[in-house]
């Protein structure tokens, strides 16, 4: 089933990069989708649908495209930068795949099935307060009540959650950008490429080769030494896996764009066989049970769901997200000014 799901997803993704028969066939539905979503945006803009402003600044980091573009590492990098600048960020997320009846905090030992894989990864990577619930407003309000020292909210995804007012919007793309430029389902876009945003962040270090606008910034993901899933204290530089041939080394990824992970390993000098899995794959069963590989490399996002797998062949490849310093400086400066203003207004009341 995972292979069939990935093949279908890969087919759709390929079609979304061109304006062929698939896109033309679905284009009328895209017009309908655009009309409905556009009306909803306008209702919030005109005040017919109520939005809520929090007592602290809100930074939303998200996608206007379907599929993995690098949103989670961008959230980790920007939230960590805000904390390093002396601010006290809290992070809210939907908690994809979790059955949530109320806002819930993400703890170090939370389970991915209870809070979502991406929020758990964010919490472990940042050591900051992370709460999950589909209603971002209620989620953020609960976080602020539980962490009164928090003075900025970073919203993981939620660009289309207009009920939550935001001060800064950062839209993340990879090099595929908006694909064929069509809205769903004929293309990958949830909203038009022309939607308002404060900054565009492209998950590719060579973005300047094709984009030179001043409001476009880049991000890269630096691979770190791998650690063994069963024994995290055991670490190896990736170069030690270069001696393994394709049938001995397997790379697997259940993320939005598995090929990006595989390409980064090849760029590091490895030549693994590859096993793409559906995004948010739950690893209820061991997909590697019948694999003959000596070593299996997986992503950090997948690792938070694989703790129960008793397989010493599995190694986790961490990444360190590095965002353009200019964007980090701009966001920190604006958030600090907004936070100071919020504090002054609260003191005057």
UniProtKB/Swiss-Prot annotation:
Any coiled-coil regions, as ranges: none
Its EC number(s): 2.7.1.130
GO MF term list: ATP binding; tetraacyldisaccharide 4'-kinase activity
GO biological processes: lipid A biosynthetic process; lipopolysaccharide core region biosynthetic process
Recorded superkingdom: Bacteria
Key words of the record: ATP-binding, Kinase, Lipid A biosynthesis, Lipid biosynthesis, Lipid metabolism, Nucleotide-binding, Transferase
Catalysed conversion reaction: a lipid A disaccharide + ATP = a lipid IVA + ADP + H(+)
Pathway: Glycolipid biosynthesis; lipid IV(A) biosynthesis; lipid IV(A) from (3R)-3-hydroxytetradecanoyl-[acyl-carrier-protein] and UDP-N-acetyl-alpha-D-glucosamine: step 6/6
Cellular compartments per GO CC: plasma membrane
Binding site for ATP: 65-72
UniProt-listed SUPFAM superfamilies: P-loop containing nucleoside triphosphate hydrolases
InterPro entries in alphabetical order: LpxK, P-loop_NTPase
Enzyme class: transferase
Disulfide bonds: none
Function: Transfers the gamma-phosphate of ATP to the 4'-position of a tetraacyldisaccharide 1-phosphate intermediate (termed DS-1-P) to form tetraacyldisaccharide 1,4'-bis-phosphate (lipid IVA).
Matching NCBIfam families: lpxK
Family indicated by similarity: Belongs to the LpxK family.
HAMAP family the UniProt entry points to: LpxK (MF_00409)
UniProt name for this protein: Tetraacyldisaccharide 4'-kinase
Organism: Ralstonia nicotianae (strain ATCC BAA-1114 / GMI1000) (Ralstonia solanacearum)
């Amino acid at each position: 089933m995972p292979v069939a799901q990935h093949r279908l997803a890969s087919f759709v993704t390929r079609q979304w990069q061109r304006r062929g028969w698939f896109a033309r066939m679905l284009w009328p539905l895209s017009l309908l989708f655009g009309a409905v979503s556009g009306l909803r945006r306008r209702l919030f803009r005109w005040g017919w649908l109520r939005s809520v402003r929090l007592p602290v600044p809100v930074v939303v980091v998200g996608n206007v495209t379907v599929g993995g573009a690098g949103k989670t590492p961008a959230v980790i990098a920007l939230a960590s930068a805000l904390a390093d600048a002396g601010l006290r960020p809290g992070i809210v997320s939907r908690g994809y795949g979790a059955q949530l009846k109320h806002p819930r905090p993400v703890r170090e030992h939370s389970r991915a099935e209870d809070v979502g894989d991406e929020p758990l990864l964010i919490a472990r990577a940042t050591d900051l307060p992370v709460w999950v619930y589909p209603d971002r407003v209620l989620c953020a309000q609960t976080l602020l009540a539980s962490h009164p020292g928090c003075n900025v909210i970073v919203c993981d995804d939620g660009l289309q959650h207009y009920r939550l007012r935001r001060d800064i919007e950062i839209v993340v793309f990879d090099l595929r950008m908006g694909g064929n430029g069509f809205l769903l389902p004929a293309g990958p876009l949830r909203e038009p490429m022309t939607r308002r945003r404060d900054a565009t962040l492209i998950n590719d270090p060579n973005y300047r080769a094709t984009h030179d606008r001043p409001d476009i910034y880049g991000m890269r993901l630096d691979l770190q030494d791998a650690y063994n899933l069963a024994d995290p204290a055991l670490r190896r530089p990736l170069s030690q896996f270069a001696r393994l041939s394709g049938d001995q080394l397997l790379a697997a990824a259940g993320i939005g764009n598995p090929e990006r992970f595989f390409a980064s390993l090849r760029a590091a000098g490895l030549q693994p066989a590859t096993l793409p899995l559906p995004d948010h794959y739950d690893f209820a069963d061991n997909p590697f049970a019948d694999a003959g590989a000596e070593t299996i490399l997986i992503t950090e996002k997948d690792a938070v769901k694989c703790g129960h797998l008793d397989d010493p062949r599995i190694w986790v490849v961490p990444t360190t997200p590095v965002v353009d310093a200019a964007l980090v400086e701009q966001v920190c400066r604006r958030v600090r000014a907004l936070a100071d203003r919020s504090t002054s207004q609260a003191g005057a009341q």
